[in-house]
């Protein structure tokens, strides 16, 4: 499991923590998705919207569960994409309530980063609460030739900053956050592999 400190001015700064202020936030990237499995940067977008995870992804999530079970996690925040919901269910089952939070969604770069509206998510996951989500909870802006609204890096970084402020303000701890590669990169400077777990200090 990777461990990271806060990134300031391009430097990675590690902190000593007392037992009270000990880092207890874990960032988990989703398992391999159907989009991940076929994506090639030199080829056209395969146009797989809100991609589910693959059989390999299911295996990755079950393996991650063995690691995560050893951690002190009492809260769970999950991105509303299908791949993160599936990953979280395989890792955590019904052990913890899901807090669905669109702030931890992926940067919209490709078709897989266009989500499903709340009524569709509620149909597929009737035991979870999506009522607080906007109909279009992913980035919405000027569309490119694919009909996709790419989220600028500046907006991604601002969203990551807002989320860090939320973690600090609410004194979030003992928490796993099932999210995405670019969002985790915006928080930490590290783009994790599928189902990699990163210990995160928001301070």
State what each model feature region is.
Residues 5-8, 17-21, 71-103, 122-138, ...:
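Conserved histidine-centered catalytic loops in small-molecule metabolism enzymes
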Residues 23-24, 28-100, 195:
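Active-site-proximal alpha-helix that buttresses catalytic centers in soluble enzyme cores
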Residues 32, 82, 104-105, 182-184:
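Catalytic metal-binding/acid-base residues of hydrolase active sites
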Residues 37-38, 42, 46-52, 94-158:
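Phosphate-handling substructures
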Residues 37-38, 87-88, 110, 186-189:
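Short glycine-/acidic-enriched loop or helix-start segments at secondary-structure transitions
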Residues 63-67, 124, 162-166:
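A generic secondary-structure signal
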Residues 78-79, 158, 178-179:
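Short beta-strand scaffold positions
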Residues 161-203:
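Active-site-adjacent alpha-helix immediately C-terminal to a catalytic or transition-state-stabilizing loop
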């Amino acid at each position: 499991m990777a461990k990271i400190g806060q990134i300031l001015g391009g430097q990675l700064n590690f902190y000593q923590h007392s037992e009270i202020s000990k880092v207890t936030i874990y960032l988990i990237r989703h398992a391999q998705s159907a989009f991940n499995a076929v994506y090639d940067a030199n080829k056209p977008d395969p146009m797989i919207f809100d991609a589910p995870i693959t059989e390999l992804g299911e295996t990755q999530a079950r393996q991650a569960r063995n690691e995560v079970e050893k951690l002190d996690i009492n809260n769970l925040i999950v991105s509303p994409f299908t791949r993160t919901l599936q990953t979280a269910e395989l890792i955590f089952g019904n052990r913890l309530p899901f807090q669905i939070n669109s702030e931890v969604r992926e940067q919209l770069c490709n078709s897989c980063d266009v989500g499903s509206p709340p009524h569709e998510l509620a149909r597929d996951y009737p035991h979870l609460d999506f009522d607080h989500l906007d109909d279009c909870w992913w980035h919405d802006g000027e569309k490119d030739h694919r009909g996709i609204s790419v989220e600028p890096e500046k907006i991604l970084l601002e969203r990551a900053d807002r989320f860090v402020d939320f973690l600090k303000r609410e004194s979030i701890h003992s928490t796993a956050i099932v999210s995405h590669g670019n969002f985790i990169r915006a928080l930490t400077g590290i783009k994790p592999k599928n189902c990699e777990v990163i210990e995160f200090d928001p301070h």
